A protein has these predicted regions:
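Bacterial N-terminal signal peptides
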Residues: 8-15
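Charged, amphipathic alpha-helical segments
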Residues: 121-130, 234-240
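C-terminal, well-structured catalytic/ligand-binding subdomain of enzymes
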Residues: 23-75, 80-81, 91-117, 140, ...
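A short, structured loop/turn motif at beta-sheet edges
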Residues: 84-85, 116-122
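A residue-level signal for conserved active-site and pocket-lining positions in enzyme catalytic cores
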Residues: 86, 125, 255
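Positively charged n-region of N-terminal signal peptides that target proteins for export
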Residues: 1-5
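Secretory/export targeting leaders with adjacent low-complexity proregions
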Residues: 127-143
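Boundary at the C-terminal end of the N-terminal hydrophobic targeting segment
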Residues: 17-21
């Protein structure tokens, strides 16, 4: 009966499944297993291909490394990144804040690029939002961490924001998907993904032991559905409908920025990167001084690593006709997940031991 109910719900909500559906977390240093602040974004977007690139410092701006959509040759819209000063920023779209204006929309990437150029701290980011021309053209939960203890979300619409500091809540961390707690009650999206994330990490949240590995290797590869109460990656079904899991057909990256606790250590920031559809990707550590070439765009504007992962993703969603693209081939994906998790955990261990 439960399987039948789940199937009917999935069919009824197919259109909703196409909404951009990022899942994220801001973790203060005291809630982190490494004692360093964390910024996580599991990204969902209609732009299937993306890359990571460096922007050098200028006379009036900091240098930074960020995630971009393929085709963004001007590096105009940063979708997550960190700068030379130990500041990092990301966003999730929010669907229950004030309506967009008719004039300016989808400016979140521009705002984040500007923040990476100008901001050292969460307070700097607040000041930036205060001074930007209004309307800002954003409807977002911006997450930031810095090298001075800042870790916060800014639930932001065209004309203002509400700030939530992770260090001021009992757990020391905050989760956001595609609704804002300051917005319209029970509106927006991502309530099940929000619950998925919290349940998958319940023990570690309670213990204050969240790590980058837990976010990329457990949550971003999990097909746990909190409403149904099971993880479909652990089952035997071949075909599973893609709805309300953290990883989705629209997922294009999962990134954890592991920050630092002092500006003197800004060079030690690590951006743990699953580029492309996360269940099919292998982790790549990025530092300010070392951006692996496979993540950067080549002559065609695409990252070789992202293209490799997108090819694997196509095998996980092999049906093209009708509603076929909504079905995951779990027989293909289960061994891929297991192998990529094993390889990624080895990379985490090697980097933490040897710095590479």
């Amino acid at each position: 009966m439960m399987k039948k109910l789940f199937f009917l719900i999935c069919m009824a909500l197919t259109a909703v499944a196409e909404v951009a559906a990022c899942t994220s977390m801001v973790v203060s240093a005291r809630a982190s297993a490494t004692g360093r602040p964390l910024l996580w974004k599991h990204r969902d977007t209609s732009a299937e291909r993306n890359f990571v690139e460096r922007v050098g410092p200028a006379e009036d701006s900091f240098g930074y490394i960020a995630l971009y959509n393929s085709g963004d040759t001007a590096l105009a819209d940063a979708w997550m990144g960190f700068n030379s000063e130990g500041f990092a920023v990301m966003n999730t779209a929010s669907y229950n804040l004030a309506p967009d204006t008719a004039v300016y929309k989808d400016r979140e990437g521009v705002v984040m690029a500007l923040a990476l150029k100008r901001c050292r701290t969460a307070d700097d980011f607040a000041a930036l939002l205060d001074t930007l021309p209004k309307p800002m053209g954003v409807q977002a939960n911006f997450g930031v961490i810095d090298a001075r203890g800042g870790a916060a979300y800014f639930e932001t619409d065209d004309y203002g924001y509400k700030r939530f500091d992770a260090g001021e809540v009992p757990e020391g961390l905050i989760v956001r998907t595609n609704f804002s707690v300051s917005g319209e009650e029970d509106a927006g999206y991502g309530y099940i993904r929000y619950e998925n994330t919290r349940r998958l990490l319940a023990d570690e949240i309670a213990a204050g032991k969240i790590s980058p590995e837990l976010l990329t290797e457990r949550v971003s590869r999990s097909f746990y559905h909190s409403l149904v109460g099971r993880d479909y990656a652990d089952g035997s079904e071949r075909w599973v409908v893609d709805l309300d899991f953290v990883p989705r057909r629209s997922s294009t990256a999962s990134i954890v920025i592991e920050g630092v606790n002092s500006p003197d250590d800004a060079a030690d920031i690590v951006m743990w990167t699953l580029l492309g559809y996360p269940p099919c990707a292998v982790i790549t550590p990025v530092t300010y001084s070392n951006l692996p070439e496979k993540l950067r765009p080549v002559d065609n504007g695409d990252s070789p690593e992202c293209l490799r992962v997108v090819e694997m993703k196509a095998k996980a969603f092999p049906i093209r006709r009708g509603n076929g693209p909504q079905y995951i081939d779990m027989d293909y994906l289960r061994p891929v997940i297991a192998d990529n998790r094993r390889r990624s955990l080895e990379i985490y261990k090697s980097f933490r031991t040897n710095g590479k």
